[in-house]
């Protein structure tokens, strides 16, 4: 329904020093400062985004382009995004407590030399998601481009769409383009395919033996996947796979294993996979494998990672960090929720089909019927603009000092607005009636002393400019 958040920083990537980000025009990211800060995102929800801006070009829920480790990111959620939930194009930003719900593509996507850390990551794909995680690195056909991506993701729960009718086929983690990384304390459940699939590995070493810290820091040229991770697939043979027709060898250095069988969720049924339910509870049970099995210590003693008592995105049987703000909790689709609901939109009078008026109308245009229109700026009409009967145009309020939204028909233009007694055409503020009254003051031509605005002055108005005579100069 809209785009998303895009943060562009100056941390390193493995593409050009600066590159153009997808989804918008001519904005660059990347640089030489791994500690760069793009600010902070804490308890931020991005819902119903990912609008298409061109062929095969959608906007991710939250895009990190060359974002550095000085940026603070925790307790953020993307829900119902058309493309990926969280995508990292290079950079070094570290993240905690992130949830990606019901994406049209991947929950998490790392690429272009991303070297960052993440803990407590939750994905539920629904029936439309492609992968819970797409882990990439290379540039073009060069799978060994440097710096090589090396995400360190620990304590994650990835829930696929299952094998029922309508579920999309795909592995939960797709490891591609020579990426490195460290993955531990994870739960992979309900895939419609493999748990983890390798493709186009380059010279990467794939191992289940975690190298020493000195190797980690100086040469992150390996992909480590802990044998303590749980992959709940139909058979152990389908836990791991190599993509057929891969262009570069994928030869693990070890015999790969993972814990098989159910992780021991408190309550997750196949009927919950499409959109959750009132009883859906992805926390681990005390007697399940997630809590009773061997847990991974923080990799190389890294203080960024918290010690946990259970595997998965929830570090204990009681730590439901989604309960107060997640779409699942606020929509009544999760047990243990404390969120009381999703606040009603202040634009509740708008129709389901809402369109922003253009800044200019230089050719004859007929607005669509059964559409709500938003007037957010001064709109100039130099051709014919026809507004159907019954249409309502809602004007946004603007801060003091900003030009008020107005519809301006310039000389040579025409406004054709033919309503009726039963279907009038209305221009009004987008604000609800209860929000219109204001104690602010302003001056008018007839009253230079301040008057109380009350319900007045919420937007500009209509201005029609023609060619008929006046007693002023020919034009004024």
Q: Which role does the model predict for each range below?
A:
Residues 393:
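Extended, charged catalytic domains and RNA/DNA-binding interfaces, predominantly
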